[in-house]
């Protein structure tokens, strides 16, 4: 049913709020194992326990976090295209249909992040300020690259190796847009964790995904138009 005037605007806003919040809740439910381990990791104070929980998170990520996050990107991509969405069934369909590809992407990204994080804490322990900042910058670029990978996985139909190469081209082909995404993502994360924590279970994932997709689609479209 379509509504006109003020009622129509209210209906559109309410519909988007419902879609974003429900999609985020579904994503969180699928990530319950990761959330449980992360919660215990934050509470842990013994190095042995921290290492075990960190290893568990790394092991779970390719099998749980990456497939569910790519499914969330797929659903939000439908929002952007104004396609009709059956949230739960579509989410499950994307999760199941892209599971193997998502797992491969997740394995590659998880190994990279594990090496980066371990090296960062090693350098931090050494007290090398210059290298510490180098790793922080590398982490920032890795964050942007990872967000672009998620977006590319639902917009570009290609094998994983080719996908990773195309993402690098898109990212460095439009550095301002890409860096803006990184800064915006960090600002949004700070805002919702420090000031708007009550919105975290409803909008954190879905809004961040929405912003990532908008930037990626803009960058990808510009790149395609610039080709002869």
Say what each PLM segment does:
Residues 1-117, 121, 128-131, 145-147, ...:
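Helix-coil boundary and N-terminal low-complexity module in membrane systems
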Residues 136-146:
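Generic alpha-helical transmembrane segments
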């Amino acid at each position: 049913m379509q509504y006109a005037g003020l009622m129509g605007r209210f209906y559109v806003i309410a519909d988007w709020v419902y879609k974003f919040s429900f999609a985020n809740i579904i994503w969180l439910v699928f990530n319950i194992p990761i959330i449980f381990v992360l919660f215990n990791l934050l509470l842990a104070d013994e190095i042995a326990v921290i290492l075990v929980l960190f290893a568990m998170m790394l092991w779970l990520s390719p099998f749980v976090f990456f497939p569910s996050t790519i499914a969330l990107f797929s659903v939000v991509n439908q929002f952007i295209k104004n396609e009709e969405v059956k949230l739960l069934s579509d989410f499950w369909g994307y999760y199941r249909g892209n599971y193997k590809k998502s797992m491969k992407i997740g394995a590659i990204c998880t190994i990279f992040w594990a090496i980066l994080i371990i090296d960062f804490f090693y350098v931090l322990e050494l007290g090398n300020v210059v290298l510490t900042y180098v790793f922080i910058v590398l982490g920032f670029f890795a964050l942007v690259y990872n967000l672009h990978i998620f977006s590319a996985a639902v917009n570009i139909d290609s094998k994983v190796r080719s996908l990773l190469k195309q993402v690098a081209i898109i990212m460095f082909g439009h550095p301002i847009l890409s860096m803006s995404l990184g800064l915006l993502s960090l600002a949004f994360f700070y805002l919702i964790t420090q000031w708007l924590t009550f919105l975290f279970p409803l909008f954190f994932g879905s809004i961040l995904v929405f912003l990532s997709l908008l930037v990626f689609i803009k960058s990808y479209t510009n790149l395609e138009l610039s080709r002869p």
